[in-house]
Regions:
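Catalytic cores and adjacent binding grooves of peptidoglycan-active enzymes
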Residues: 29-34, 38-91
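Extended, low-complexity, intrinsically disordered C-terminal regulatory tails
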Residues: 1-33
């Protein structure tokens, strides 16, 4: 997941966003079959970013990583739970 971490940091820098923080890896609750448990997915939080900024963040990370990764900015009713999900997709 090193390429994902580097891409997230680079995208945040380019977009002038707060420093992202890894919020979930393989030691938290995820759905059955989650790639987090296989060390193939990470979630990143950027404090106080708008949904529009999150969508731009998603697009930039996806552009940097190219194919082979799924990048999703997930939004929740409680906006403090919004985060960027990045997973390696070997399919």
């Amino acid at each position: 997941m090193d390429p994902a971490i580097r891409a997230v940091m680079e995208a945040a820098r380019r977009l002038d966003l707060p420093t992202p923080v890894i919020t979930w890896d393989n030691d938290s609750r995820h759905s059955n079959g989650s790639l987090h448990y296989d060390n193939q997915a990470l979630d990143f939080r950027g404090n106080n970013i708008s949904v529009a900024q999150g969508q731009a963040f998603q697009a930039e990370v996806s552009r940097i990583l190219g194919t082979g990764y799924d990048v999703i900015f997930e939004t929740f009713r409680n906006g403090s739970n919004n985060h960027l999900h990045v997973e390696f997709d070997s399919n």
